[in-house]
């Protein structure tokens, strides 16, 4: 059997493919602020609609945020909020 007949397996390294949601949100926030937009309104617009036009290309923010699924971003935001506002 030739090597062309075998199925190849492609593996991603978890470390290299893992995008840090926190870092991406901070970069996107800063890019929006630098361009004169209200960062919170724009990020919420993107999360609700999925339309990347809410995020500028400035500082590669649009490409960065699109690498993360919107539900993953929302999950991280909820986790962070609850951790910060938990009663002891």
UniProtKB/Swiss-Prot annotation:
<dbReference type="InterPro" id="IPR009309">
    <property type="entry name" value="IreB"/>
</dbReference>
<protein>
    <recommendedName>
        <fullName>UPF0297 protein BLi02868/BL02032</fullName>
    </recommendedName>
</protein>
<dbReference type="Pfam" id="PF06135">
    <property type="entry name" value="IreB"/>
</dbReference>
<comment type="similarity">
    <text>Belongs to the UPF0297 family.</text>
</comment>
